UniProtKB/Swiss-Prot annotation:
Catalyzes the sequential NAD-dependent oxidations of L-histidinol to L-histidinaldehyde and then to L-histidine. It comes from Mycolicibacterium paratuberculosis (strain ATCC BAA-968 / K-10). Binds 1 zinc ion per subunit. The gene is hisD. Signal peptide: none annotated. Its cofactor is Zn(2+). Zn(2+) binds at Q308, H311, D411, H470. This is Histidinol dehydrogenase. GO terms for molecular function: histidinol dehydrogenase activity; NAD binding; zinc ion binding. It catalyses: L-histidinol + 2 NAD(+) + H2O = L-histidine + 2 NADH + 3 H(+). Residues 8-20 have a biased composition (Polar residues). The active site is at E377 (proton acceptor), H378 (proton acceptor). CDD domains: Histidinol_dh. Residues 1-25 are annotated as: Disordered. PROSITE patterns: HISOL_DEHYDROGENASE.
Length: 480
């Protein structure tokens, strides 16, 4: 029998929950509990660090880069990561070489990923819509892409060429004219970003890549600057120039918007720069929730929980189930699979953290209530009639339906975007899409007769709000 670590049927919070020595994950019993929204938000497992705590460290970095540009960004990189590239902008020859040297199987897989993502995102394009409110009175909503976008691709525990694809594809589909990818320099590659990142950029047709990472990368994207002008060892200094970046050897043109995931320092920098540029979101650690019943395969459930825990020690893995048998079997499967997991120390820490748990509920209806309150970045539905259950989900970054739609598929080749809202923000936010990179502009076009027809109402409302000059602007048009 599965025995949860804590029973919240009457009271309690997550402050003291931890797994027992025999269980990789903590257990929470919500059976019989009153599942109000407020109570669930305080009781459900969630980790992540508070961005506010690192703002004092990040603010001087942003200020220095704003004042001194590339020199400051490169100095911070050398101090934090022990590597200082010759310049910020990567020569196009390095992109060509990275693609030529890329393992053929990886290249083929990336091409499949790109093709499938492009197919899905092409269908997200919006068309202009004109509404006619009367003779000579129209309002058109015109969709205009952001002009220049910076796409941040992290480096750390793993290399993420998939993040290049997931950020670039919707931006290109939206019609963004100028894209720059920023990724940390790597000492083992002579200060260049990881070659797989460079190869992915080249496959996507992106020719502007900056070798800069962390908070300093976000600041440099936001404020721009002047590159060092130094040559990269082994590459010609004849770097490509583009319309968005005249004299590309020198000018680092600031962007209008920054997207892409990163650590807490990257997130803090995005917060500090968002008065100057747009951002996609303040992403927290990745998370998976699985809503499963007795029909689910515990080996699959355990494997999927482990797969997201592999990202980060702060990653959240949550199973919600009305089945004690499934909870016990999944707990046993986790214990069996963990020893053979390559990144088992990282995974063990994530599964054992306060952000992860196996949650018992009374029934499937209660489970749906719980996962809607949790609002997971990734939500798997492994139940009987999974499609019907998925139709009742109102808060999730992405929903994966049935045993053959695991989150790993969405991370790479489902065609969906894997840049998704975290930390419960799926209650009010969406994942990255073509819409992220579009601005809706209302174009108002009225004739004299159309304005006259509604002028009395405008004047009345202006007087009601004590804004007489508004009404006068209407009257003067009809004075003779």
């Amino acid at each position: 029998m599965y025995r949860p670590d804590i029973d919240l049927s009457s009271s309690g919070t997550m402050d003291t929950v931890s797994p027992t020595p025999a269980s990789p994950m903590a257990g929470i019993d919500l059976r019989g509990a009153e599942l109000t929204a407020a109570r669930l938000r305080s009781a459900l497992p969630r980790g992540g660090a508070d961005v506010e705590t690192v703002l004092p460290k990040v603010r001087p970095i942003v200020q220095a880069v704003a004042e001194r540009g590339a020199d400051a960004a490169l100095e911070f990189g050398a101090s934090f990561d022990g590597v200082r590239p010759a310049a910020v902008r990567v020569p196009e020859a390095a992109l060509d070489k990275a693609l030529a040297d890329l393992d053929a199987a990886v290249a083929d897989a990336l091409r499949v990923m790109i093709d499938r993502a492009r197919a899905v995102h092409a269908d997200q394009r919006r068309t202009d819509v004109t509404t006619t409110l009367g003779p000579g009175a129209t309002v058109t909503e015109r969709w205009v892409p952001v002009e220049r976008v910076g796409l941040y691709v992290p480096g750390g525990n793993a290399v993420y060429p998939s993040s290049v694809v997931m950020n670039v594809v919707p931006a290109q589909a939206a019609g963004v004219a100028s894209l720059v990818v920023a990724s940390p320099p790597q000492a083992q590659f002579d200060g260049l970003p990881h070659p797989t990142i460079l190869a992915a950029a080249r496959l996507l047709g992106v020719d502007e890549v900056w070798a800069v990472g962390g908070a300093q990368a976000v600041a440099l994207l936001a404020y721009g600057g002047t590159d060092t002008g130094a040559e990269w060892p082994g590459f010609s200094s004849d770097r490509a120039r583009s319309a968005s970046s005249p004299g590309a050897d020198a000018e680092l043109v600031p962007v209008d918007m920054i997207t892409g995931p990163g650590n807490i320092y990257v997130t803090a920098a995005k917060r500090l720069c968002r008065s100057r540029v747009g951002i996609d979101a303040e992403a927290g650690p990745t998370e998976i929730a699985i809503l499963a019943d007795h029909t689910a395969d515990p080996a699959h459930v355990a494997a999927d929980l482990i797969s997201q825990a592999e990202h980060d020690e702060m990653a959240g893995s949550v199973l919600v189930t009305p089945s004690e048998d499934l909870a016990a079997a999944t707990d046993a499967e986790l214990a069996a699979q963990l020893p053979t997991t390559v990144h088992r120390e990282r995974v063990t820490a994530a599964l054992g953290g306060r952000q992860s748990a196996i949650i018992l509920v009374d029934d499937l209806d209660a489970g749906i209530t719980v996962v809607n309150a949790y609002a997971a970045e990734h939500l798997e539905i492994q139940t009987a009639d999974a499609a019907a259950v998925a139709g009742r989900i109102r808060a999730a970054g992405a929903v994966f339906v049935g045993p053959y739609s695991p989150v790993s598929l969405g991370d790479y080749c489902a065609g969906s975007n894997h840049v998704l809202p975290t930390a419960g923000s799926a209650r009010h936010s969406s994942g990255l899409s073509v819409q992220t990179f579009l601005r809706g502009i209302h174009v108002v076009d009225y004739t004299e007769a159309a304005l006259k027809d509604v002028s009395g109402h405008v004047i009345t409302l202006a007087q009601a709000e004590d804004l007489p000059a508004h009404g006068e602007a209407i009257r003067r048009r009809f004075e003779r």
